[in-house]
Amino acid sequence: MRDITHFLLATLLSLATLACRHDTPPADGSLSRQLPPDTKEILRQLNDRDNREEALRLADSLAALPPSDDPWLEIRIAQAVANTLYKFRRDPSDAIRVQERALAVYRLHPDAADDPADLLSTLGHYYRRKGMREKEVEVIQEAMDWCVAHPEKLNRGFVYTFADLSSTYSDLGLYDKAMEAISRSIDYSLQLDSFTISDLYRMKAGIFWELEQHDSTLYYARQALKRGEE
């Protein structure tokens, strides 16, 4: 049983995980307003996995520009730039710097962010990769507090926030709390057309693995594989 479970988990962990979940949102996503055509093209280029060097050059160029006079657009572009720097550069320091820039704009203009929970939890995710535990916990806690205070604004940021919270608890060996957080993330996902549900089931399988509950591990590992094929 343990060998089979280990094989399933190893297979799952070789796939794209929630650690890479913050791809640049599509230009026609859930936005409070429409992006200009040239900005849509910039987002496409920043997210071009087939031309990473050009994407990084563009990201570095945009990061060097002075802030936009439009807070909404500044946050949008900064998040996209940070995402590119995070995905395509080994050291997350540059991604952190640009995401912090987006957060600073949000602090001044709270209504300018379409998804504050995503903005905050993404930064926490970057801090986690850098090993900045205190800052990671601080911003993820803020993201969670925002979700709790705004249940009527349910969106993908809710899913990300509680998945990130689960990862933080897992890192600390607090698996019961990690299970509670990932279960909540799954609940939110199911309310959003099962958004990234395969990754969430994979994460839940990993927590059951740490708890040595192998039947449950197998169940959620298989669910993750099944949903990933849909």
Report each predicted region and the residues it spans.
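Amphipathic alpha-helical segments of tetratricopeptide repeats
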Residues: D60-A64, E100-L108, Q141-A149, S183-L190, ...
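TPR/TPR-like alpha-solenoid signature
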Residues: T39-K40, Q79-A80, S121, A163, ...
